[in-house]
Design a protein with these regions (language model features):
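Helix-loop junctions and terminal segments of transmembrane helices
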Residues: 23-24, 54-70, 149, 208-209, ...
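Membrane-interface junctions at transmembrane-helix termini in multi-pass inner-membrane proteins
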Residues: 2-5, 135-162, 183, 204, ...
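Interhelical loop/hinge segments that connect adjacent transmembrane helices in multipass membrane
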Residues: 2, 182-186, 200-243, 286, ...
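Signature of the first transmembrane helix
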Residues: 2-66, 93, 97-101, 133, ...
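N-terminal membrane topogenesis motif
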Residues: 1-21, 76-87, 122-124, 204, ...
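Interfacial segments at transmembrane-helix termini and the short loops linking adjacent helices
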Residues: 106-129, 322-353, 461-462
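Hydrophobic alpha-helical transmembrane segments
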Residues: 13, 157-207, 228, 380-385, ...
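Transmembrane alpha-helical segments of multi-pass transport proteins
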Residues: 128, 382, 432-479
Length: 479
């Protein structure tokens, strides 16, 4: 069962990545690059409003993993917890839908910069439907988290994959065969999220409460879990603000079409972090066990070995995308204009994301020791640097300014953070880690890919699939 859960977890993550890169070019092709900016803004808004979760999903998953019982009648506490959180989320969702509905005209007319050929009334209606879609997706995340920690990971990932297929294929079908309208896209998202929320909620309740025992709202449940949920909410607030500030400010300061280019560049730049998180899923449990056993020798060996493998994979992917950014963007979107506009932004965003990906190993080392305060402190410092930097660089340099700010902030803060954590817990191998796991892979991979780029010239006259194959061969050869 454990192996099956791991396989379906990987399938779920793989599908999320694959679907993103498959469907985005279709949306760009059907709707146009400027209208795609509304989808990019919807994604940003969804992540920002996830703060309204208030740490409830993290708290539910922790409580389920701690208290779930296979015995009949043994889950009364969890049923009351789920009912309490569910009713609280109902209030949160209604509030989100109401607020987005009211402020939609302000978003369209005062925040986003639409061109003259876009109908503001259609965009306002679309934003309102997307607000309803968000209102149902957030509680669905709560129910998904509950299923994952009940070890119903196969079912949870199947439901999530089917939901992803439904919301994307339904939108593509309606846009292609009926009417090319951002309103139609928004309605498809709303209906798909509503169905997914209702189905995954029903499945979670059946799993926790097969005997259909009546659960009730309990105030004491909130009182007993508020400290943990508040702490998680604060970490979430910092993380969300840090991750979305650049997109939010770009959407405010630049035309919608420019924001579309930035959104596409951001999508490409997340790949190194996804690669790193796959390593993190495997490494963190072993870190935690070795820290608990105070086995410093094996912890050091695992940190160096894992760090080297992570750097090898992350840097190969990152530097390949940097060297072939224009080629990759053209092969992905089929647009030479997108490739020209977004290539430099991709490179700068990749620098920042690569630094964060390489920091994942020290980050998990700190978590294994229960050392989380430094992450909060560095998050706050990052915001203090990033926010003013974004306003200055975007106003001065335009689209590329967002990438400059992101790269500089991570270069300053992330570098300091990882050195501090490694020095605190594994000081004896700090220099060796920097040389073996960072500098050596960075230099060797850069040289290899530079040589491969010289001997394998890829131009935009190639077919899209041929470009993908050439980039893939170059990256694989480096490994």
């Amino acid at each position: 069962m454990l192996k099956l859960n791991i396989i379906f977890n990987l399938l779920g993550k793989s599908w999320a990545l694959i679907s993103t890169f498959v469907f985005i070019p279709l949306y760009v092709h059907i709707l146009g690059i400027e209208m795609y900016g509304i989808i990019g803004f919807y994604t940003t808004l969804l992540v920002i409003l996830a703060f309204a979760d208030l740490g409830l999903t993290a708290t539910l998953t922790r409580e389920v993993s701690r208290n779930y019982s296979h015995q009949k009648g043994g889950n009364t506490y969890l049923m009351d917890l789920l009912k309490t959180y569910e009713l609280l989320y109902l209030f949160i969702s209604i509030t989100i839908a109401f607020i987005v509905y009211i402020v939609a005209p302000l978003i369209v007319n005062r925040w986003l910069h639409l061109s003259s050929n876009m109908n503001p009334e259609d965009v306002i209606l679309a934003v309102r439907y997307l607000g309803f879609a968000i209102a149902f997706q957030l509680p669905a995340n709560l129910f998904y988290g509950g299923l994952m920690w009940l070890e119903k990971q196969v079912s949870a990932n199947i439901l999530q994959i089917l939901w992803g297929i439904l919301r994307n294929l339904s939108a593509i079908f309606v846009l292609y065969y009926f009417s090319v309208s951002i309103v139609n896209f928004a309605i498809c998202q709303f209906v798909s999220n509503l169905l997914y929320c209702l189905i995954i909620r029903s499945y979670l309740w059946i799993s926790i409460n097969p005997d259909r025992v009546k659960a009730a709202f309990k105030k004491n449940v909130l009182l007993s879990t508020w400290r943990y949920s508040t702490g998680m909410a604060m970490m979430s607030l910092i993380s969300i603000t840090l991750g979305q500030a650049d997109k939010l400010i770009v959407s405010k300061l630049l035309p919608l079409k420019e924001f579309s280019y930035y959104s596409l560049a951001s999508t490409v730049s997340i790949v190194p972090m996804i690669v790193a998180e796959i390593f993190g899923m495997a490494i963190f449990p072993r870190f935690a066990r070795l820290v608990k056993e105070n086995d410093i020798d094996n912890l050091s060996k695992l940190f160096l070995k894992g760090g080297y493998l992570l750097s090898l994979c992350v840097l190969t992917v990152s530097i390949s995308l940097m060297f072939f950014s224009r080629n990759f963007l053209f092969a992905w979107t089929g647009s030479s204009v997108v490739a020209a506009k977004a290539q430099n932004v991709v490179i700068l965003l990749l620098i920042g994301q690569t630094l964060q990906a390489l920091a994942l190993m020290p980050y998990y080392l700190g978590l294994a020791h229960g050392y989380v305060r430094i992450n909060l402190q560095m998050g706050v410092i990052s915001l203090l640097i990033l926010l003013p930097c974004l306003f200055l660089t975007i106003n001065k340099f335009g689209l590329i300014g967002g990438g400059i700010s992101w790269a500089l902030t991570n270069l300053l803060v992330t570098t300091f953070l990882v050195v501090k954590i490694v020095k605190r817990f594994l000081s004896s191998i700090l220099l060796r880690w920097i040389l073996q796991c960072i500098l050596f892979p960075l230099i060797s991979i850069t040289i290899c890919l530079w040589v491969l780029k010289l001997i394998t010239p890829i131009n935009l006259m190639f077919s899209q699939w041929r470009i993908f194959v050439c980039i893939g061969i170059s990256a694989t050869t480096t490994l």
